[in-house]
Structures are given as C-alpha cells and as structure tokens.
Amino acid sequence: MGEVEISARAYGKMCLHASRYPHAAVNGLLLAPATRSGECLCLTDCVPLFHSHLALSVMLEVALNQVDVWATQAGLVVAGYYHANAVLDDQSPGPLALKIAGRIAEFFPNAVLIMLDNKKLVTWPRVPPVIVLENQGLQWVPKDKNLVMWRDWEESRQMVGALLEGRAHQHLVDFDCHLDDIRQDWTNQRLNTQITQWSGSTDGHA
C-alpha cells in the first residue's frame, strides 16, 4: 500500500473527540477523496461517531449510512476508522475496531485503521499520538512510519494545542450527541471553520 497523509482537520478532530471524553472509548470514520490503487491516501476529514454506544449495531448502521451519503455528496469516501480505547495504556485494536475497520476495507481496500495512543495524547505532544495500521490479508499491521505523512505536523500540533487550551473540544459533536439532540451538527462545521481560520492565520491564507 502507498503513502497516507493526515490533514490537520482529520488529526485535530480525532484528538478533540478523545479529549472531550477522556475516560471513555471513542471512535469515528476517516474521510478522503477517492484514489486509485498506489496513490497517496489523503485523510482530509473525520466524523466522530460514538462515546457511549460503540457496540450498538443499529446505531452504527444509521451512522454509517448517513456519513456515507454525506461524504459522497462532498466528493469523499469513507477511507478508514479511528478508535481510542478507554484504558490509558491500551493501544491495541479490539474486536469492535477490527470488525468496523474490516467492513470499511471490504468497500475501500486501501482503508487504514488509526489507534490513538492515549499516553501521548497530551496538549502539546512531541510526536504524533497515533498508530496507523493497514490491512494485509486478514490482519491489521502497523504501517511503515516512512509512509505516514503529515501535511504539516508542527502546524497540526500547534493547532490542536491551541484548540484544547481554548476548550474547543467542548463544542465537538459526535453521532451520540446528534442522536440525543438532532439539532446538533455531527459534521462539525463550526469546528471546521475554527480549524480553517487557525490554519489561515498561520500561513496567510484560509
């Protein structure tokens, strides 16, 4: 499999999701423009799913269908899955993570599974707190770190630190929140705007 690039938006929303619910397992879907085999997979966005209903298949089906429709309209595909375990020192994908990632890989063979490393998930991490896995046959194995690219790691690091200090994670909406109150926006356009504005303020353009 080829290179994977993680955007500031995708990385930021994963971290904010885990930070909003630090004592719970959280998960979500990774989105990317459709690519041909061998091309760089650019993870441009993510959709936070659950923090309390992770194992409820009915809820998952509803979420997957809605995200797939929305992503298609935006010219994107569901290209992966992210998961943070509730236990601080557990970075291994459990049965649920493997099941959902495997299902995504059935439709998108180049899909990746990202496990968040809770120990490294601090306001100002020195290294990316993520473990990227790829599907090889029937197993998910760590991807060669030389093939995991960052559009701008330092910018992503600074942005997430600033957002966390500003408590932006309190405004993140996952699908659980949306199911409790359908007025809440699981696409997180408000947060997307904050991320875009932050990036624009650092490089001179939005």
Curated annotation (Swiss-Prot):
Q: Which CDD domains match?
A: MPN_UPF0172
Molecular function via GO: membrane insertase activity
User: Domain of life here?
Assistant: Eukaryota
Q: Which UniProt keywords apply?
A: Endoplasmic reticulum, Membrane
GO CC terms on record? cytoplasm; EMC complex
Q: How does it sit in the membrane?
A: Peripheral membrane protein
* Domain called MPN: residue spans: 4-139
Principal location listed in the UniProt entry: endoplasmic reticulum
Does the keyword field hold Membrane?
yes
Q: One GO BP annotation here?
A: tail-anchored membrane protein insertion into ER membrane
Entry's localization field: Endoplasmic reticulum membrane
Q: InterPro entries annotated for this entry?
A: EMC8/9, MPN
| Protein family according to the UniProt entry | Belongs to the EMC8/EMC9 family.
Record-linked PANTHER family: ER MEMBRANE PROTEIN COMPLEX (PTHR12941), ER MEMBRANE PROTEIN COMPLEX SUBUNIT 9 (PTHR12941:SF12)
- State what this protein does: Part of the endoplasmic reticulum membrane protein complex (EMC) that enables the energy-independent insertion into endoplasmic reticulum membranes of newly synthesized membrane proteins. Preferentially accommodates proteins with transmembrane domains that are weakly hydrophobic or contain destabilizing features such as charged and aromatic residues. Involved in the cotranslational insertion of multi-pass membrane proteins in which stop-transfer membrane-anchor sequences become ER membrane spanning helices.
**Could you describe the subunit structure of this protein?**
Component of the ER membrane protein complex (EMC). EMC8 and EMC9 are mutually exclusive subunits of the EMC complex.
Q: What is this protein called?
A: ER membrane protein complex subunit 9
Q: Which organism is it from?
A: Rattus norvegicus (Rat)
Tell me what gene encodes this. Answer: Emc9
